């Protein structure tokens, strides 16, 4: 992780942490809100995690390693995108943390991405994560209704 800036965003989803967790870890649900990406992992600490797909006509791969996992509560991974234009070295991998907090009959989902080098990078990352969280919310709330 080379940068010291962090992008953070959150959303409240009207569903249980279990339902949200399923949407984070089940490939057929991830595909609905993560720009059509195919996710692969066995969801264990130390295991690889990859998202592959096509964006604006170009193939991409985003990858990382699971650092921490507490089902229905926390998922922390490293993250590297082949579209970043950077070399695939550990210092160019960001750290992404998903936290699920029950709140009544809803779940607050907080996402942070650490290791960003510029304020412009923070803004771009937050916009990206806001879009992902909106899609996650629609996917989960649509499935729950």
Indicate where each model-derived feature is located.
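Hydrophobic ligand-binding cavity/cleft-lining segments
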Residues: 1-40
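A conserved amphipathic terminal alpha-helix motif
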Residues: 108, 114-145
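Hydrophobic pocket/interface hotspot
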Residues: 20-21, 30, 49-51, 66, ...
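Extracellular beta-rich ligand/substrate-recognition surface
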Residues: 1-4, 52, 56
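Tryptophan-centric aromatic hotspots in well-structured domains and transmembrane helices
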Residues: 21-24, 43, 79-81, 125, ...
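Residues at helix-coil transition
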Residues: 25-26, 71, 141-142
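Hydrophobic-ligand binding "helix-grip"
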Residues: 39-42, 55-104, 108, 114
């Amino acid at each position: 992780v080379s940068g010291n800036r962090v992008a953070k965003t959150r959303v409240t989803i009207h569903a249980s942490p279990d339902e949200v967790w399923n949407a984070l870890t089940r490939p057929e649900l991830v595909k609905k809100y993560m720009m059509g990406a195919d996710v692969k992992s066995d969801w264990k600490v130390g295991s690889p995690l990859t998202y592959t797909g096509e964006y604006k006509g170009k193939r991409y791969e985003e990858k990382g390693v699971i650092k921490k996992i507490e089902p229905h509560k926390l998922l922390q991974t490293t993250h590297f995108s082949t579209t970043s234009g950077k070399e695939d070295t550990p210092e160019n991998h960001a750290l992404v943390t998903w936290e699920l907090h029950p709140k009544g009959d809803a779940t607050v989902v907080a996402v942070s991405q650490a290791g960003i080098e510029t304020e412009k990078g923070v803004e771009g990352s937050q916009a990206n994560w806001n879009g992902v969280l909106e899609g996650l919310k629609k996917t989960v709330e649509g499935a729950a209704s």
